[in-house]
């Protein structure tokens, strides 16, 4: 693949490849604008998406994780099908040479600590995706949300990989 060839070439020069992963939203303003690379089983299953008619304007932690931001199609990251899709994507990146990830819009994905609407997205996706290689280390990441709530999560990641969570 072109991605693998790029990673191989970068590694020849000691350059690490960090993938900008967008795991919670896709497209721009409507489902009609979804990327053609999204499989039909994701695109056409309404249970995998948050209600696009509900917009989040950072009113609450619930709203920024359960509603769409300015009408951008937002995946239901608590759904196991969505989690498996994310795991598959991240594993393919690692298997093809990615050294780490920057997670765009991480604050828009619920955590286990979100009372009443939390999910295991982060622990499940990061652990399963990164354990495709045998070495692992525990990494504690502090995620600070716009509502000034702090949640500490323990992640499992491949040793020598870089995980950045973009807020």
Question: Whereabouts are the PLM-identified features?
Answer:
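N-terminal structural segment of carbohydrate-active enzymes
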Residues: 1-8, 12-16, 24, 61, ...
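Broad hydrophobic/π-residue packing in well-ordered secondary structure
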Residues: 1, 48-49, 55, 61-65, ...
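Core domains of carbohydrate- and sulfate-ester-processing enzymes
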Residues: 33-72
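The substrate-binding groove and active-site-proximal loops of carbohydrate-active enzymes
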Residues: 1, 68-83, 99-117
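Active-site-proximal N-terminal segment of extracellular/periplasmic enzymes that hydrolyze or transfer
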Residues: 30
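Active-site-adjacent beta->alpha loops and helix N-cap segments on the catalytic face
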Residues: 2-3, 56-64, 69, 115-125
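Active-site-proximal helices and loops of the catalytic beta/alpha 8
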Residues: 7-19, 25, 35-41, 88-167
């Amino acid at each position: 693949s072109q991605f693998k060839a790029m990673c191989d070439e970068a590694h020849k020069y000691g350059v690490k490849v960090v993938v900008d992963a967008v795991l919670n939203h896709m497209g721009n303003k409507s489902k009609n604008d979804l990327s053609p690379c999204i499989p039909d089983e994701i695109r056409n299953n309404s249970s995998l998406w948050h209600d696009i008619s509900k917009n989040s304007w950072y009113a609450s932690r619930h709203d920024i994780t359960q509603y769409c931001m300015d009408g951008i199609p937002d995946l239901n990251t608590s759904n196991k099908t969505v989690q498996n899709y994310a795991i598959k994507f991240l594993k393919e990146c690692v298997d093809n040479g990615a050294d780490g990830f920057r997670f765009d819009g991480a604050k828009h994905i619920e955590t286990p600590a979100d009372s009443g609407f939390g999910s295991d997205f982060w622990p499940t996706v990061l652990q399963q995706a990164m354990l495709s290689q045998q070495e692992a280390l525990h990494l504690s990441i502090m995620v600070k949300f716009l509502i000034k709530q702090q949640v500490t999560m323990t992640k499992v990641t491949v040793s020598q990989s870089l995980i950045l969570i973009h807020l």
